[in-house]
Amino acid sequence: MLKHVAAALLLATAMPVVAQSPAPAAAPAPAARSIAATPPKLIVAISVDQFSADLFSEYRQYYTGGLKRLTSEGAVFPRGYQSHAATETCPGHSTILTGSRPSRTGIIANNWFDLDAKREDKNLYCAEDESQPGSSSDKYEASPLHLKVPTLGGRMKAANPATRVVSVAGKDRAAIMMGGATADQVWWLGGPQGYVSYKGVAPTPLVTQVNQAFAQRLAQPNPGFELPAQCVSKDFPVQAGNRTVGTGRFARDAGDYKGFRISPEQDAMTLAFAAAAIENMQLGKQAQTDIISIGLSATDYVGHTFGTEGTESCIQVDRLDTELGAFFDKLDKDGIDYVVVLTADHGGHDLPERHRMNAMPMEQRVDMALTPKALNATIAEKAGLPGKKVIWSDGPSGDIYYDKGLTAAQRARVETEALKYLRAHPQVQTVFTKAEIAATPSPSGPPESWSLIQEARASFYPSRSGDLLLLLKPRVMSIPEQAVMGSVATHGSPWDTDRRVPILFWRKGMQHFEQPLGVETVDILPSLAALIKLPVPKDQIDGRCLDLVAGKDDSCAGQ
């Protein structure tokens, strides 16, 4: 079995990149059946990092592979929402398979401050165990410790210990937040060495084979991808600081790990790993239902590095469609009865420099005065505490924490001056205090109609959230203009460009329908749980079951 898996991996990863042809179109579906007639044997949950609803819809007419299958044969919710304010990778992934918003998962951001942490670095990473000696937010031991609720896989395993729960991803936080604390296997791309897991977890024979295949792929240069016809109009240079973006093809030298990671090659490797894991572990081939979650991280790396509207992002989506098609075809060939859900952890926003070229002259980069060091100096001066550390934050938006060394009187002055200064700043939409957010009821109703403070409440976890929450205005990119640019674009805002994501369900033979009204990613868990007849108490989650049966039947009946 392992030799067969290894051969398949090498075939998938060693083909000349520019010569790969699109996956064949899926065979015509048989007569429609109810998606809920019998429980599927395998749940395949896919997150495409930074796959915004805008990016999904922009190229929808060009899909020929896996995305075409999902959009033409499945249940399509093009207006899904990561409904909270802090639209970052870790909080977003924490919602997908828990049915819970960050206010319940405890994952309020990628990083937050714990000023009582027993180490010098008070900035905590969402997927670390900060109690480990010598750890920091940059050099950490990965852990699901901070996730406060079970995932779908965890609930399935609690109901039936025979259930296999596997999670693979490009990023550790994607694999960990979707897999949960009790997953059987959790793997992520840890660097040039390949896929890794938690400290002390040795590679299985399969993972060793996967990493050998990865090493062989990495050792080959990539001459670049051909430019699809739909990408030709995107092919023009855009200057952002010292960076020029917009015309890339993902060419890289042999051994260039960074180039591999920021390209469609990464997702192709992760999907090859997932397919090999399904075959090797015989997922979906036993009496119980198994689950595999797959975090495809390349779209996010591409979006940050090049923006969302150049050739780079266009090629990335085209390749994603092709690779997903090949992955689904492999599962079909193996005769597995599987259900797919595909969504994203958040959306994204293109770089202001290209927006200004394309009818949006008001697009801006954030004022350097709002960056952490500058903001602390300003507030300290205004509060009569020049040179003192008065606030902690890690960006020009998001949570702000008061220093623990302030007296009550100093803290009051700092809050007064911070609110006065920030609320008067032309790039700031609003600033909420912790008390204001805490007093707001947990939101309900259509996510597209929520107010900003309701979005903030969905991101709020009292023991982790800051004393203030700073939200920038729309069309203000939270990366300042600099002579030397790292990332040129990002996400994380409370606006719909970052909140809206597609949510797509598919199972062989189901009747296609599309529902354009807003739903939430927290609705995914109860919807899948209903298909496998897994009871989930409604008071333990924030989502609702989505009926995936077109017409009068109801896949949520009995939930």
Swiss-Prot record:
Zn(2+) 2 binds at D300, H304, H491. CDD domains: AP-SPAP. Keywords: Disulfide bond, Hydrolase, Metal-binding, Phosphoprotein, Secreted, Signal, Zinc. InterPro entries: Alkaline_phosphatase_core_sf, Alkaline_phosphatase_prok, Phosphodiest/P_Trfase. Disulfide bonds join C90-C126, C231-C314, C545-C556. SUPFAM superfamilies: Alkaline phosphatase-like. One of its GO terms (cellular component) is extracellular region. This is Alkaline phosphatase PhoK. It comes from Sphingomonas sp.
